[in-house]
Amino acid sequence: MTTLKIDPHKSWIPLREKADEISNEKHKILLNEVANHMEAEIKGQLDPLMNTLTAEPVYHFWRVSDVNMILNGYEEVSSFYSNMFQNGGEQFEVVTKRIIVNDDGVITEGKVKQVYTKDNLKLMGVTTDTFSEIDNSNLWLSNTQLITVWPSDPDLKLVGEDIYFGENPMETLKPINEDEIPDYYKIN
């Protein structure tokens, strides 16, 4: 049996385990809220995901490209996720190595892995000029350093996300085979 190189449905397990280990009820709720958010996002469930957020969430994506991205408010965040789900972008795995929780929120640190088809990479502007190996495989796996700050409000709802990428995901691409991804994964 081939070992899976990506398994998105394992992403929220470390958060649930950390919540089970601690006694502070507020921290337990915050950890489970982040886990609920992550699970809904990775499973493409918009309403449960948005229910974890405040009425006016704010997202910051740092070092996604040459331009950082900011999403302000319910409509922008909801639209972002709707577009992500339509394009299969929710199918990623967060491999969490460290979790920090306090009364103000949660911080997760680790890696984020995502599979891209050769055709999707080309639609994203990747060419043989920018990535000479693109035509060598139909499927590619990125594996990028990620820190996410999950601030919360006094009602223990998530205010949004501050997402810091340690590197450009396109610079970490490695070929992957179909038998190295879970059966539930949809290749778009």
Language model region names:
Residues M1-N188:
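C-terminal and inter-domain tail/linker signature
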